[in-house]
A protein has these predicted regions:
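Helix-to-loop junction immediately C-terminal to a conserved catalytic motif
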Residues: 48
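Conserved ABC ATPase "signature" region
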Residues: 63-64, 111-129
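Conserved ABC ATPase signature
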Residues: 134-138, 142
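A short, proline-enriched helix->beta-strand linker immediately N-terminal to the Walker B motif
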Residues: 153-157
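Catalytic Walker B motif of ABC-type/P-loop ATPase nucleotide-binding domains
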Residues: 159-162
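Helix N-cap at the start of a conserved alpha-helix in ABC-type nucleotide-binding domains
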Residues: 170-172
Length: 252
């Protein structure tokens, strides 16, 4: 379980996170939503210890990640897989080597075991035959899948998805949403989706956390989201629908 307790963070005296608290239960998929500049990415970086709060705590399985040694922080980080926005594949490595990278960096596995694990991960993301391809030979959706294979290579307990559908056409975005749902259930991981894509939220999330002007404005289930009359939350949802120009369900 992850607990965020009264988190504060400012940059150049500009508050970005203000008294943010959040509890993420094991096995759930939670979507962190909000406008650009609302603090979503900054909160995500705090979850894996890339940023330290000015005040407050982040606890992973009861451990304050900002009060441990660097070696212990590395151990905690190994429990997280991250699907970075855009995929962030290494251009100089083929798909196989991209997925193998964390295995070579953080484990002492033999080459045979690395080969087996990479192939297993590529099959899980439904790309069993792309190992030899370079990133520039892959479509946007395929890059996301390879990046997701890399994110699950170390068998994490938590996966952070940073804007997983940004830049994808609706059909490909739907496929990525379905893959995320499938992997979260098959691998029994906790999913944390940082997004402004309400289509993805409705497709994959169990709960939603809405950041507004650096504060945690609203937290609830999808059912509670549908029933909410919170004016700020509703304005965000309606703006998302308007910007996309179609009903919030991509399959509608």
């Amino acid at each position: 379980m992850i607990r965020v307790e009264h988190l504060y963070k400012s940059f150049d005296d500009r508050p970005v996170l203000v008294d943010v608290s959040l509890e993420i239960q094991d096995g759930e998929t939670i979507a962190i939503i909000g406008r650009s500049g609302s603090g979503k990415s900054v909160l995500m970086k705090h979850l894996i210890g890339l940023l330290k709060p000015d005040r407050g705590r982040v606890l992973v399985d009861g451990v304050d990640i900002n009060a441990v040694s660097y070696s212990e922080l590395r151990r905690i980080r190994r429990q997280f897989g991250v699907l970075f926005q855009g995929g962030a594949l290494f251009d100089s490595m083929n798909a196989f080597e991209n997925v193998a990278f964390p295995l070579r960096t953080f484990t002492n596995l033999s080459e045979e075991d690395i080969r087996r694990r990479v192939q297993e991960c590529l099959e899980l993301v439904q790309l069993p035959d792309v190992g030899a391809k370079m990133p520039d030979e892959l479509s946007g959706g395929m890059k996301k899948r390879v990046a997701l294979a890399r994110a699950i290579a170390l068998k994490p307990r938590y996966i952070i998805y940073d804007e997983p559908t940004t830049g994808l056409d609706p059909e490909t975005a739907n496929a990525i949403d379905e893959l995320i749902c499938d992997l979260n259930h098959r691998l029994n991981v906790t999913g944390i989706v940082v997004t402004h894509d309400m289509h993805s939220v409705l497709s994959i999330a169990d709960r939603v956390a809405f950041l507004y002007q650096g504060r945690m404005h609203w937290i609830g289930t999808l059912d509670e989201l549908h029933r909410s009359d919170d004016p700020i939350l509703l304005a965000f949802v309606k703006a998302s629908e308007y910007q996309i120009g179609q009903p919030l369900s991509r399959t509608a």
